[in-house]
Amino acid sequence: MKAPHLALFALLAAACLPDAQAADGPVNTRLERVLAETPLIDGHNDLPWMIRERFKGDLGQIDFASDTSHIPPPPDGVALMTDLPRLRAGKVGAQFWSVWVPVDLKGLEAVQTTLEQIDIVKRLVTRYPADLEMAYSASDIRRIHKAHKVASLIGIEGGHQINDSLAVLRQMYDLGARYMTLTHTRNTAWADSATDAPTHHGLTPFGVDVVHEMNRLGMLVDLSHVSPETMKAALAASEAPVIYSHSSARALVDHPRDVPDDVLRLVAQNGGGAGALQCAAVRRPLHRPARPRQGGVGGLGARAP
């Protein structure tokens, strides 16, 4: 294995906006102590794409050091959900910035757009050096957290973004990507998505090669968005812990993007970690009754090693 995996953390979270208010009293005191010592990792944040689409990638149009929620959203969009004050208030120790591109972008266009997304992340971090710093390893996250800054990492949200090329995967790693979600909302040529008709019933031989190359590099295999068959195939193929950057338990919310209990048990055996998705925007009303229970459910077995 080329590099230590970033899954060496006790806490992994993926959130848009928290639904619950901060805890009070002894619980809050304990949380403050834990989060001062252990970096809370938000596994998925789509801010780079919002900056690209709304501001054409021009960071000068937003003041990330102030509350950005007052910026009017586009007619068919949502308000910005992230800024430095809210990262600090949420005690975020490390943030995976998603460099997602739409699944209808193919080939070299998908690769180029991914590179442009990576550029947005790095320029954002450079613009706020007192608060943000790029991280490429577990030790980087610990060091940056101790310096009271938010460690910034890059996650690729879809295997379509490497254009079926292990060489592109390697170069994305060299540019800072530390996880890749194997699919987004549609199948790739080598892996099935949770929200598309099954084609491969898991991974193709090339898909297994992708997992093995990610293992070799020290790049996290992210199983959010993939089908249960793909989850199981990737868990069988992976020689390192996997993650779910933004998925929840299907037993609580019966959504195709969430993780069945039998797979969660395999994740525990793998030593991997599952984040908790708190973004109400991706929940249809049909699925929302379980939301009040999510914050209080523990002991599911999956953990970060």
Give names to the regions the model predicted.
Residues 199-217, 234-244:
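Alpha-helix-loop-beta-strand connector modules within alpha/beta enzyme cores
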Residues 210-223, 227-233, 261-272:
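Substrate-binding cleft of carbohydrate-active enzyme catalytic domains
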Residues 165-169, 230-240:
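Distinct, well-ordered alpha-helical segments
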Residues 228-229, 249-251, 280-283:
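Short, catalytically relevant binding-site loops at active-site mouths
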Residues 21-200, 254-305:
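N-terminal hydrophobic targeting/anchoring segments and the immediately downstream early-domain regions
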Residues 1-7:
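Bacterial N-terminal signal peptides that target proteins for export
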